[in-house]
Amino acid sequence: MEADVAIMGGGLAGLSLARQLRLEKPDIRIVVLERGKRPAPEASYKVGESSVEVAAHYYGERLKLKEHIDAAQLPKLGLRFFFPHGDNGDVTQRLEIGPSDYPTVPSYQLDRGRFENYLHDQVVADGVTVFDRARVQRVELRPGGRHEIGFVHGDEVRTVTCRWVVDAAGRSKILKRKLGLEKDGNLRNGAVWFRLGAEVDISDMSDDAEWRARTGPSRRFSTNHFMGPGYWVWFIPLGSGSTSVGIVFDNTMHNVKEMNSFEKSMNWLRENEPQCAALVERYRDTLQDFLCYQDYSYSCKQVYSADRWCITGEAGVFIDPFYSPGSDFIAYSNEFVGDLILRDLRGEDVAPLARAYDRVFLQLAEIVFMLYEGLYPKFGNGFVMTQKILWDSVIYLGVTCLLYFNRKWHDLAFLGRIDTELARYNDLLRSVADHFKRQPILHDASLAGEYVDLTKTYLFGRNLNQELLIEYTDDDALIAKLRENIGLLEELAVSIHNNVDISRNLQPLRAAEPA
């Protein structure tokens, strides 16, 4: 069997790439080798259910899946954070940060089984050849010729030869292991999680009318984070009617052996998050699964090669689930991979691009790793984390999303034009990241019970989410906006270094100026 592209792994990264390539080049020959079987079960399948703006744009707009997402998945009421107070027995007394209404530019809660089943059916309808329950036995990379993959499908041993090999096989890390590309991620965090077959609503934690009225849509639709020293607990709703619950922790502060079963995790929740434990207890009879990763984070020495192989998704880099960046990195990587493949098939020399894209992607990953280093010990402190969350939101919306939505991360000519701006930006990130790592725990009792509403107030009155809809007439206008956003970061950095509460700059929305 011959193909232009063979993708090892038919999960979210691999199927998304196949869909992306067929949309851009309908006659491209793609073979996908997936070890699992279809259809996948809904709910109790994979984590990574929470998407943010980049991933939502990639799946909905770039892959043209918005109709399915709107009909079969759930809208996301942003990220929501609750910080500790006393014994965490009264949620109304916890500092809360989150939106009271849906953002202008949407994000989604994705039932991974349901979404991947639909995506699988779409790529098959697009003409992609997909082998489910296919086990890769060997990969022979031939830089001077066509690569060859041997795999077992049912009782049959088969071979596919191809111009490009893409490893999207997740934690199997086929090419990374074959080529010795493993790299430590410098984070020591773990997670346990489970799904409940019920619509668990965290608003049921209190019948306080004023607290319940803070949000229009139910808090259930947020990715909810219950924060504490060295940990956070998530509650994420799924379109199938189930709820995903997880505990993520710093391995140096919490012992995975104390939560590596459902009963142990319940005991841990009773001690640290009693209201979360009580809410889960109501639905324990609906338990669908339980899984655990003791040490989930890692990087990669190289992800793209001029020898016509690429690594994407969790096969390459996985950082941390906090802020839900997993699918964003699928989007970034697949954009680079797709561009390399299509240019090569048009006869272009992609060797310089492969080196440049590899550098840009791994630098993106390095920046995000830096945002998490030394962070988990501060999770229990509302003042520090308010600063951190607001700062990181400007980084994400004002720079990362701005460049992605305008398709500039793989525009090397444009990146060359903003080299000075990116150097300023990187210096800012490192300076503030170092500050947060060194910052002492500063307590402010006045924060108890406060609500930072990210729908009604914005830093300096600018809704950076809404500004993602601005259409720029040319690159000069986009660069001007980028400089404005970096200027905002510079102003915030001064306050952060002086331990001044930057939430005081939250203001009602001012009208966005046209580009």
Residue map of PLM features:
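Glycine-rich FAD pyrophosphate-binding loop
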Residues: 22-47
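Beta1/beta-strand and adjacent pyrophosphate-binding region of the FAD-binding site
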Residues: 1-13, 31
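N-terminal FAD cofactor-binding segment of flavoenzymes
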Residues: 40-89
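Redox-cofactor binding/interface segments in oxidoreductases and associated redox assembly factors
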Residues: 8, 167, 311
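C-terminal helical "tail/cap" subdomain of flavin- and related membrane-associated enzymes
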Residues: 340-515
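FAD/FMN-dependent oxidoreductases across multiple families
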Residues: 229-231, 237-241, 253-340, 344-376
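Short beta-strand to alpha-helix junction loop
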Residues: 100-121, 255-260
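Predominantly flavin-linked oxidoreductase catalytic cores and closely associated redox partners
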Residues: 122-276, 334
